[in-house]
Regions:
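Multi-pass alpha-helical transmembrane bundle typical of ion/small-solute transporters
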Residues: 1-197
Length: 197
């Protein structure tokens, strides 16, 4: 989930900061990840998913895993490697659903989110291309652009982590103790470092 969606979420940020050292970008994005999940862990008594897994059908962590639950992340890695867009939420969370209504709920939320994002993106794109492209295509970037870009990209990343941490946390106990939290946070943080390197 992290490998697939992080590139979609912060890909333009990474592309426009290719001149920066990889470790600086990793520490920035990884630091935001750590702050975001630590906040959830403190606020929600060990839950790193911002309580997104408290709905019926996902409220208990699995005591054993089925083939589909283990294979889902492997399929996701293969699809990501093939550069195919995929809904990580639907692919991962639906394999843990305990009832058909849970799958329907996940599918409904995913589809409504996609339609909303498509509509909003289309409106913004039309406004930007018609209004701003002619005005700003020939101008030089302001010195304020980079800090504003880092702020907005960091905010987008934090919100993505708040929404999609459930895709990873679905494999974990719903309330992590300190050792489990450090292991989870460290594993993802190091994984982000490998991804950025």
């Amino acid at each position: 989930a992290i490998a697939n969606d992080s590139i979609q979420t912060i890909g333009t940020f990474l592309a426009s900061n290719q001149d920066k050292p990889w470790w600086l970008l990793w520490l920035f994005i990884g630091g935001i990840f750590l702050i975001t999940i630590t906040t959830s862990w403190f606020l929600f008594d060990g839950d790193v998913s911002y309580q997104r897994l408290t709905s019926k059908g996902f409220d208990e962590s699995p005591s054993s895993f089925t083939f589909l639950q283990v294979a889902a992340p492997l399929f996701l890695l293969i699809l990501t490697r093939l550069r195919m867009p995929v809904s990580t939420t639907f692919l991962l969370l639906s394999s843990f659903a305990t009832s058909a209504s849970s799958i329907t709920g996940v599918l409904g939320k995913s589809l409504s989110g996609y339609f909303l994002a498509f509509g909003a993106g289309l409106v913004v794109w039309l406004l930007v291309t018609k209004t701003f492209e002619k005005r700003f295509s020939e101008t030089k970037a302001s010195k304020f652009w980079t800090p504003i870009q880092w702020l907005t990209s960091g905010s987008l990343w934090a919100v993505w982590v708040m929404q999609d941490a459930a895709n990873v946390a679905v494999y974990l106990p719903r309330s992590l103790n300190v050792l489990q939290f450090v292991g989870f946070a460290g594993f993802i943080f190091i994984g982000l470092g490998i991804l950025f390197y």
